[in-house]
Design a protein with these regions (language model features):
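Basic, flexible Lys/Arg- and Gly-enriched helix-loop patches that mediate nucleic-acid binding at interfaces
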Residues: 1-196
Length: 199
């Protein structure tokens, strides 16, 4: 059966199955799978926190990450420096980064004290350090970055850092539906799948 976990990544864990330097990885706290493996959907850098999805369905993971499917990601970002109306406009219109144009689909100020203010941003791709690089292109520094949503899945308030929750069937079907993967068929009397979706 298709399974999806949502994991609340803490700071300091790397998004890799093994680290030559011996740093903790996001895979270490996941439940073991028999005759299967967890595939990570997208990544977060070592200093970022928040929602990471894992699935045992490699095709689903691939489609959720592929830029052509434009799956929206949402982040809460704490920024050091003044984000002027002009900068907000630049970030929504698009900025040339070293790997091409990038932009936020939405950016909303969420308050804060002094030079540290929180913003909520949305974008439909997940290039390496893209959120940080967009702000850095405007001379601003990101001091905290938390992913709060990936597609139809939001980070639940009750989920603590370093913990995971398994999505229920309805949540899985909703997320899979965003990338045109049909629900898997029901199971027979002995829990054996009696048909797979053709994708």
């Amino acid at each position: 059966r298709r399974r999806i976990l949502m994991y609340y990544k803490p700071e300091g864990e790397i998004c890799s199955a093994h680290d030559p330097e011996g740093r903790p990885t996001v895979f270490e706290r996941l439940p073991p799978l028999n005759h299967d493996r967890w595939v990570m959907v997208g990544r977060l850098d070592i200093n970022s926190t928040g929602l990471l999805l894992f699935t045992n369905d490699g095709e689903l993971a691939h489609r959720l990450m592929h830029p052509s499917n434009e799956i929206e990601r949402e982040y809460a970002v704490r920024v050091m420096g003044e984000v002027t109306p002009e900068i907000m406009l630049n970030l929504k219109r698009g900025v040339m980064l070293e790997d091409g144009m990038a932009q936020f689909d939405d950016i909303v100020e969420k308050g804060g004290e002094g030079i540290n203010k929180w913003y909520q941003v949305k974008l439909k791709e997940g290039r390496n350090r893209e959120v940080r690089r967009l702000f850095e292109s405007q001379g601003l520094k990101v001091s905290r970055l938390l992913r709060i949503r990936y597609g139809s899945v939001s980070l639940p308030r009750e989920l603590r850092t370093g913990r995971y929750l398994e999505l229920d069937r309805r949540e899985i079907d909703t997320l899979a539906g965003l990338v045109n993967i049909r629900p898997r068929q029901g199971t027979g009397l002995y829990g054996i799948e009696i048909g797979r979706a053709h994708v």
